[in-house]
Amino acid sequence: QGMLKNLINDFKSENSLSYSIDFQNCMNEIENKANLTYYIQNIEGLKWATRHLNGHAAEFVNQNIEALKPISAFALQFNLNTKDCYSSAYLHFNSAEKEETKNIWTVQLDAPLRSEINLVRNHYTKKWELAVQDELLNLYLISSQGEIIWKRKLEEGILGEIKQIDLYKNKKFQMIFNTTNKVFLVDRNGRDVLKFPIMLDEPTKLPISLFDYEKNKNYRILVSSGKKHFMYNKFGEKIKGWKLSRTLSPAIHPAEHYVIGGRDYIIMAEENGTLHILNRKGESRIQISEKIEFSQNTIQVIQGKTTETSMMVTIDKNGAQKNILFDGSIDSSLQFSFEKNTQYEFSKGHNIRTKGDVLNVNGPKINLMYSFDEAELLPAKIFDFSDHFYLSVTDKKGSKTYLFRDTNEIIDGFPLYGKTTGVLQDLNNDGELNLITSGETGTIFNYAVD
């Protein structure tokens, strides 16, 4: 079954011989019919073929591997008739080394991916690993080499991201996340830490909010269970001084924390259109002048050095952009209108909007408008490495993952097969970028990005 899944995924990701340009060019040059056709592609195939050569020929190949690298395809054919045997050869030489996106490894889960692809740091090797959950509720930790380190069955699905904290302030990390009824804290061996998981007083539909006010690892965990809101310390104990214990309607997104001008701002949106701006005690810091018809878009904070140069932005359910100032007013002079159900995010200084099959990005490094063919776009993500910016977006309907660089161009070799938004990272800290995405059968792909 596993081999069959791999074959299906290779076909869908166009990682099979029939999709190779070199193979297609070769087939156009040689006879359609032959008694025997022997085909070799790239230098790795040539190395493999030496086992079928006589000693002198095999030795020649092994001694001249570097010189033979530009050979991208080789075919040898034999045709027999009643008296004679005819042979012909085809050799394709490529003087320019091609930049290709390669599938480094794949990992097959027991079921399709349910969670986001979460990157977590291995505190021993400093490399990045993957924490994911499949639809059978199995939680996996996967190494940077594509090996499943452990698998653990949970009772419920994980909500939102899996994050990391340094509970003991010793540079050793634990994974923190929640399900509908519990908050988990798990070490890198998959074991529960301290009194975790803690049972919630009431079920929640939202991921937890994780705050580190002073960047001193004295974490706070905010859980919004409908209209009720509970603040915990990092040991899973309730904070008694938290003031906003109840709202008139449920929170619609996890609360976010920002520091602007040396002051704390906790932002929480309610279902009834109320936007709360709180201090770290849960007391109201700013009263917003009007209610907002919130959509699925979270509140994005465009952060300056002061509150006067900062603002909160969202696109409401009618497609209207709301620019909320930190004095509580809404600046109508800066409002724009978009189509309903426009997805909006402000990330790394860039405004990212997706609607249907159209992607718009505006910012200091990437500026593009790209229309995909009848696509169903997932939210795009921006990444920056070594002063270069990249944007990943996936067409869920077409099962294609795209990667743009800051020249506003699609990177060579893309799109590639993928059903989830690609996550970009240098997994092994070797200067080589990896794009991680997954397929519909539960296969995770690690693509090399040149």
Label each PLM-derived region with a short phrase.
Residues 1-24:
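Single conserved position on a long alpha-helix in the C-terminal lobe of the eukaryotic protein kinase
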Residues 31-100:
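Leucine-rich, highly hydrophobic segment in Treponema pallidum outer-membrane-associated proteins
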Residues 96-115, 147-154, 193-202, 239-247, ...:
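Aromatic (tryptophan-biased) beta-strands that constitute blades/sheets of beta-rich domains
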Residues 106-137:
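Beta-strand-rich domains and repeat architectures in extracellular enzymes and scaffolds
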Residues 112-118, 157-165, 202-211, 248-257, ...:
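Repeated scaffold domains used in trafficking and secretory/extracellular systems
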Residues 120, 124-127, 166-174, 212-220, ...:
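Acidic, glycine-anchored loop motifs typical of Ca2+
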Residues 136-140, 180-184, 226-230, 271-275, ...:
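Loop/turn residues immediately N-terminal
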Residues 421-450:
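Blade-level signature of beta-propeller repeat domains, shared across WD40, Kelch, NHL, RCC1
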